[in-house]
């Protein structure tokens, strides 16, 4: 288990460089965040649709003190098959500048090109639309698969704050 965690920390730069992949997507999730947990089916759908097309996905658990066992239980409970990693030291949070869960960060050749919401289903905490009307992350992924050039963009993610490290 320790070897896996060390490998994940040691390969941060390599992961974000997207060698051979069209993009790397970090999906920041919180095990205790209701908004984040409600997005599990959508995140899994995006993974199943875009990973065969060259998009590399990782669930990122930024919770200090979270364990590999707790991460695996959460993944199982919510039906995730997306590869996951712990980010208790906030290396990925810092690199992406993520502040809430759920949030997505998309990197192409090591450059952050998107940070923000999955879609616009949540307008604010406690205020949700029945269905999303704008699918921000999916638009970015479709453009990456098509090889379109993109400028960096950011949207406001709604969810639970990522706890600061003391």
Predicted regions and their residues:
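Thiol/selenol-based redox catalytic cores and closely related redox-interacting motifs
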Residues: 89-165
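Structural microenvironment flanking redox-active thiols in thiol-disulfide oxidoreductases
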Residues: 37-78, 86-95
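N-terminal "domain-start" segment that seeds a small globular fold
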Residues: 2-21, 28
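Soluble non-cytosolic domains of exported or imported proteins
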Residues: 23, 34-37, 65, 131-135
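Second-shell loop/turn segments in exported
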Residues: 30-34, 59-64, 126-130
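Loop/turn elements at helix/coil->beta-strand transitions in domains of secreted/extracellular proteins
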Residues: 21-24, 53-57, 80-82, 101, ...
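Structural recognition of the beta-strand scaffold that forms the well-ordered cores
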Residues: 24-27, 56-61, 83-86, 115
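Short active-site neighborhood of thiol/selenol oxidoreductases, capturing the structured segment around
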Residues: 19-34, 141
């Amino acid at each position: 288990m320790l070897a896996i965690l060390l490998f994940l920390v040691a390969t941060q730069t390599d992961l974000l460089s997207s060698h051979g992949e069209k993009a790397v997507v970090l999906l920041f999730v919180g095990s205790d965040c209701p908004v984040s947990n409600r997005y599990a089916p959508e995140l899994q759908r995006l993974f199943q649709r875009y990973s065969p097309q060259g998009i590399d996905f990782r669930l990122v658990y930024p919770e200090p003190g979270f364990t590999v066992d707790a991460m695996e239980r959460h993944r199982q409970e919510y039906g995730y098959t997306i590869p996951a990693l712990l980010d208790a030291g906030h290396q990925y949070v810092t690199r992406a500048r993520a502040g809430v869960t759920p949030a997505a960060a998309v990197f192409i050749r090591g450059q952050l090109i998107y940070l923000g919401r999955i879609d616009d289903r949540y307008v604010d905490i406690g205020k949700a639309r029945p269905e999303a009307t704008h699918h921000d992350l999916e638009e970015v992924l479709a453009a990456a698969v098509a090889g379109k050039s993109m400028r960096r963009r950011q949207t406001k993610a709604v969810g639970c704050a990522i706890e600061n490290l003391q």
